Curated annotation (Swiss-Prot):
PANTHER family: DNA-DIRECTED RNA POLYMERASE, DNA-DIRECTED RNA POLYMERASE SUBUNIT BETA. GO terms for biological process: DNA-templated transcription. It is an enzyme of class 2 (transferase). SMART domains: RPOLA_N. InterPro entries: DNA-dir_RpoC_beta_prime (IPR045867), DNA-dir_RpoC_beta_prime_bact (IPR012754), RNA_pol_asu (IPR000722), RNA_pol_N (IPR006592), RNA_pol_Rpb1_1 (IPR007080), RNA_pol_Rpb1_3 (IPR007066), RNA_pol_Rpb1_3_sf (IPR042102), RNA_pol_Rpb1_4 (IPR007083). Keywords: DNA-directed RNA polymerase, Magnesium, Metal-binding, Nucleotidyltransferase, Transcription, Transferase, Zinc. The gene is rpoC. Binds 1 Mg(2+) ion per subunit. Its cofactor is Mg(2+); Zn(2+). This is DNA-directed RNA polymerase subunit beta'. Zn(2+) 1 binds at residues 70, 72, 85, 88. Zn(2+) 2 binds at residues 808, 882, 889, 892.
Amino acid sequence: MSDLLGILKQQGQSEEFDAIKIALASPELIRSWSYGEVKKPETINYRTFKPERDGLFCAKTFGPVKDYECLCGKYKRLKHRGVICEKCGVELALAKVRRERMGHIELASPVAHIWFLKSLPSRIGLLLDMTLRDIERVLYFEAFVVVDPGMTELERGQLLNDEAYLDAMEQYGDEFDARMGAEAIRDLLRQIDLEDEIRNLREELPTTNSETKIKKITKRLKLLEAFYESGNKPEWMIMDVLPVLPPDLRPLVPLDGGRFATSDLNDLYRRVINRNNRLKRLLDLNAPDIIVRNEKRMLQESVDALLDNGRRGRAITGTNKRPLKSLADMIKGKQGRFRQNLLGKRVDYSGRSVIVVGPTLKLHQCGLPKKMALELFKPFIFSKLEFRGLATTIKAAKKMVEREESVVWDILDDVIREHPILLNRAPTLHRLGIQAFEPVLIEGKAIQLHPLVCTAYNADFDGDQMAVHVPLTLEAQLEARSLMMSTNNILSPASGEPIIVPSQDVVLGLYYLTREKVNALGEGKIYSSAQEAQNFYEAGHLDIHAKIKIRMPKEDGETGYHLVETTVGRAILAEILPKGMPFDYINRTMTKKVISKVIDSCYRKFGLKETVIFADQLMYTGFKYATRSGASIGIEDMEIPDDKASIIEHADNEVREIESQFRSGLVTNGERYNKVIDIWSRTNELVAKSMMSKIATEEVTDAKGNKVRQESFNPIFMMADSGARGSAAQIRQLAGMRGLMAAPDGSIIETPITANFREGLNVFQYFISTHGARKGLADTALKTANSGYLTRRLVDVAQDVVITEDDCGTDTGILMQPLIEGGDIVEPLHERVLGRVVASDVYIPTQTEPVVKAGTLLDEEWVEKLEKHGVDQVMVRSPITCQTRFGLCAKCYGRDLARGHLVNTGEAVGIIAAQSIGEPGTQLTMRTFHIGGAASRATAANNIQIKTKGVIRLHNIKTVTHENKNLVAVSRSGEVTIVDEFGRERERYKVPYGAVISAQDNSPVEAGQVIATWDPHTHPVISEVSGRLKFVDLIDGITMNRQTDELTGLSNIVIIDAKQRSAAGRDLRPMVKLVTDEGDDIYLAGTNVPAQYYLPVDAIVNFEDGSLVGIGDVIARIPQERSKTRDITGGLPRVADLFEARKPKDSAVMAEVSGLVNFGKETKGKRRLIINVSEDQCHEELIPKWRHISVFEGEHVERGEIIAEGALNPHDILRLLGVGALANYIVNEVQDVYRLQGVKINDKHIEVIVRQMLRKRVITFAGDSKFLVGEQVEESAMLQENDKLLAEGKQIARGTPILLGITKASLATESFISAASFQETTRVLTEAAVSGKVDELRGLKENVMVGRLIPAGTGYTYHQSRKAKRARVAAGGDSSATHTVTASDVEHALSEALNADNHEH
């Protein structure tokens, strides 16, 4: 018998599952869940507080109210378990069954489920091919629908109003069947033959031509196939039976004073039951049709309200005019089931308290108040007390702890030793917001935090609070120690740079310690060791800043000693350097940047342990000497420059001068405003400069008595210079002038604040300042919410990106080049490729062997090698081109930035990427910059002046040579680069059309040389051949006017706008041609395109008809409208726009194909641009007239070249230039925003997000697959289907990548659980239920929600081994694994056991 019990025990083990399916519930299924019908609307008896029988809380249906106790009290006790009381019908069980037992309501008339009716697109409507409006008229009893036309002329699904129905009855009698209400709809749904419909639609699809029809058919087809494949029946969308939620999930609690607090669901259920019972009664009484109809309609409405209140009509409200919370509201939104209870739960063994600074702690420690520790570790203390025999029972132990006996504290010390705890500070924006520490017991009530981890937590000690959590299991402690310990998180996962960097006081102390002072006590002395110098300093014979010489051991492995010039402070600092670290790293003034570099190189050279010790030592030293320095801010330290008054007076005079010019009409108001703003910005700079030079240096006497200048020891200057706190801009406001302020609309007020804070502001100045200050606060509040929402969307889209294999074997990648803007290298190549894997061998011209082989992970050494050889582009593997089906491969991702080695399998790189991009979001600005105002007014560039010596190279520039030997550019996308002697690119500039280039290709240039010039305010039309000018359609007074310039007296020919021309000139297209003296066409070199140039509106022609024109002459010029400047969106909104893949307003028009351009006939307000690919193939594009088109007739364009200027549209880039170009565009644009704020983020994080935006394919060719043309499918799904088709030798489907914004991509994910918990819960669940979706639980969110370990990190291996074990069981290899027991197994075991018993007898 024992083995039978063994089998049954195994049966009770936790169930293991790999997927969750959602489907429609059939009426039979609902009845099978139920433990009884709810017949009455009563809840509980208000006198006895006992549930009413057959009511909403009935104990007979839902189970007993108290454990193992029936309602009437006849049976109590465990021994009656399972007995059903004869008197009250209650089964004796645990009271918690009231949380899981459901009931049901038998509806007297069928009711439509509102989700499938009203959630767009209406599923019922799609199936029946009726409009939602019509279906609603039937359901809410306003019209009849023909269910069965019989032999009549009526159509199935046709609507009849009352008159039409009566007429039809008169005409046909009983030959047809027309009804109203949900029954009619249910019968229509029943009549649908899914297979038949699918076949018909599949046949109809290829024959239709209309776009809308194809769309409609595809939608219906997909829905019908979903129903057919999932086994859902359409009529189940109409309900005969309504399930009732278990009573403990909709509680009714008596409050004191005889009132009750109840869940809204009870009200909604009561309303349904009341109406249902009334309807039953009316049907029994054979009431008049109109009354029954009304009751049925009311029943439908009350069920609607129960399922989703407010989706149709007005929401039903409770007593306090507040809409009742329906079942749908329970699960959606931030307070819904998904986000409140499944994704975020409260945890026990936790506490929170205020944090204070713990400057004496080691990096891996935190101070934990004894009171908190006692409470948090209680169970551990109890067990220890019992184990040591100090307490006999847990109760006794509890008493001991409550009395706080002295032995308890000893045991607490014991329990806490080596038991890490987690500290978390909200908001947790990235993974460094939770770290593990070893607790040190302290008196007091505040948690002590190590100062160096403040940066990671973004914590300060102005009243911040932190939460403590205790990892209980051994595994949890192990993970906390090895992965989350603060000492293991020295590098930031966002950029791979150290995040444990001293700041504020520590920086100030180290800076003060390492400064030099002229003529300090003991200058010029020589000491035998750093220790000796320190002793002399401690004894008071040396100043800490004195310049001295010290005998130091040589570096680079050389033996012997040498003298080093240094200061006493630096010698003191040398004592804490790790062994083997060169002294010259710190033999300089230590600012924050220098310290960060030192820590970084320490980590790379000596590893983790040394770095942690070094960082701690730096902190202790910094604090010590910051205290010794006595640096403090006094009002005298804000030194106002002497020449401030004269500078301001000068500016005032300039402004007066401009005002008088404006009054005499020489300048416009706009010009006057701009000039005034410019003057004041310049003045502000001058005052700031003068002030900084005064504060930054001081005059002292050196040892020889000469006057010399040295860096000042002014505390304000020291704080700013060291990077401890404050900036030049802030000092400027304290001691210079405050400068220009912005008005509420973002424009700049032209009266500046000339005072500074030391002098004080007058009322007017104060008033101007208030606006900016307030806007700052409002901005900050908005920014936090927006940034949080962006992070949430990013996490959602990338949550299932995990490293799942080592190498996907692809040889593609993206090309990395240094980022060069204008003459500056913004990001050198070695920074961009560090930590990436090379995709294809890197060669240099002088060698045949590759410098770096494909598959190499580029670390610091390799990168230096690339730099040395002058490599300027490398093809690296990227997440975007990774071929792994689910997740990513380690090679495509490269280095784990926070650890410094190749990423491990199972690393959740998607979440890390999302956090890295989202966390700095709060530092980004919120505003859109308006052009105008000193902040963003860049003068229009009109030349290229180079910064470095090198050789000039021209890239895809078409030029013609002017007679004065200069080159003139006649191409648009041309660029010029300057390369150094190794052939490395140093500078890159765009060369506009019409620029005059004064240097030849491949000619050497010097720094400072101007190599190209152009007029920034006009677009020229350049002649590419020489000849005589011939006017075509240029008729004076009709298509052109002559305007005389007042100043010069010259007359110009100007083209008139077509709208303003007379009827005769409307269709004329003015152009100029170049012809020979005989009047024959001249063709462009090497083509059969005549040299002719169409002239747009407002073009100014420089030559008269018939005049001679040379090569490179400017025939006409088109003034550039500076008025139509677009607002530049910056900061957070820009990042959001990029990731949401939003189409910009007035986006650039790009050439769809490569070919020759010509202009067709103009249509209303638009120009027709035709690109001829070949004789018989061309592409047309309509472009609004006001857009500036940057190509000319007869010009050759490449696919993807910009035809009309504007912001680029990412969808166009993907379509025309491919995935690589798109990736580059998004990465660079996002990086531009972050770089402006000085935030470093590694490119690969953005690439991971872009990969997720490119998950879908649009099917272009269906082949033999189940997909339809134009359908959007997950790439992995398409590949899987193709694998299947290939195996069967059928035609595979093909698709093109499509870009989705992050919100859309999250909602379009395969996992319905993840999508439903993100946004639009109702829509996602409706769609999933109808198609019977199966969630494979691949992502992180889904697994958190079903309560399993996430398939990432340590959980990744757990899931792998679990699946492997299951596979072994399936193969029959491992018998020790869990059996699945069938009923026959149990029968067999039982009979064997009984037989054995018989034999014994």
